[in-house]
């Protein structure tokens, strides 16, 4: 029997690469990303980070300590164009600069985006300064998110929250119930409704909500995916996921 050595031919990197750091207990974020980017020429990779419950500032900071390790394991020794940290309250708790530093320790050439910073960019792009804020968090964590948006210069016209303490419970909120709850939000004086948390099933109902409420609706995942696509220059408009994606 003859054995023949054949030289392989390797592809060169062509599509932009997205690396998502998803919370281990998040049901929604991967699905939302895939639903938006499935017809685009991008490569999408995911690694999960341990989430500590209950969701408190202290536990969210503790979670962020593993960001470098988790980032490193997304295609080790390969470049990623944009690393996405998939936690709104976690970014607010730890601080964007801290998250960015930890990501770049593993992927120094990568762009970095997070839900909270992406939300600010999206609101500014749409010239929105007054928002109604909805979160699924505990009262204490809800208030920390509220203060973050205030400190970024936004007026909060109303605020509602679920008072859920565990991330895996947030992902189990019934989508139809959520639509009904958000449909009744007090929007007096608001230019938009922002719904926080990557684990809530908001993105699939955003179009319907905007029609029902006759106002702009933004969510953590929507803003995050939009900003990711902006960073990799793939942000052409897309139907079905709210006004933000139609404004590109």
Where are these regions (language model features)?
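Glycine/small-residue-rich loop that forms an oxyanion/phosphate-binding "nest" at active or ligand-binding sites
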Residues: 70-115
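C-terminal functional extensions of proteins
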Residues: 218-248
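Conserved beta-alpha
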Residues: 99-106, 110-167, 245-246
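Hydrophobic alpha-helical
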Residues: 179-209, 225
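Hydrophobic alpha-helical segments within soluble ligand-binding/sensing domains
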Residues: 66-68, 72, 112-127, 222-234
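Short, well-structured alpha-helical segments in soluble
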Residues: 64-78, 177-190
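Periplasmic-binding protein-like
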Residues: 80-86, 132-133, 190-197
């Amino acid at each position: 029997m003859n054995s023949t050595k054949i030289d392989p031919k390797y592809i060169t990197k062509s599509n932009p690469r997205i690396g998502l750091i998803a919370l281990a207990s998040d049901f929604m974020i991967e699905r939302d990303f895939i639903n938006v980017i499935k017809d685009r020429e991008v490569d999408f990779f995911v690694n999960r980070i341990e989430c500590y419950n209950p969701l408190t500032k202290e536990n969210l900071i503790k979670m962020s300590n593993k960001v470098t390790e988790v980032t490193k394991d997304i295609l080790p020794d390969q470049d990623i164009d944009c690393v996405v940290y998939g936690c709104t309250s976690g970014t607010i708790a730890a601080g964007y600069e801290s998250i960015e530093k930890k990501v770049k320790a593993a992927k120094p050439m990568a762009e970095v985006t997070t839900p909270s910073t992406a939300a600010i960019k999206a609101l500014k792009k749409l010239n929105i300064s007054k928002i109604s804020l909805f979160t699924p968090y505990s009262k204490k964590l809800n208030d920390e998110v509220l203060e973050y948006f205030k400190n970024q210069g936004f007026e909060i016209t109303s605020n509602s929250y679920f008072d859920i303490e565990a991330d895996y419970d947030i992902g189990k909120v019934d989508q139809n119930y959520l639509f009904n709850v958000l449909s009744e939000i007090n929007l007096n004086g608001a230019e938009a409704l922002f719904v926080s948390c990557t684990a809530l099933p908001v993105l699939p109902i955003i179009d319907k909500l905007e029609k029902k409420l006759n106002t702009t609706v933004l969510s953590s995942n929507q803003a995050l995916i939009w900003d990711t696509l902006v960073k990799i220059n793939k942000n052409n408009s897309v139907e079905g996921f709210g006004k933000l994606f139609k404004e590109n």
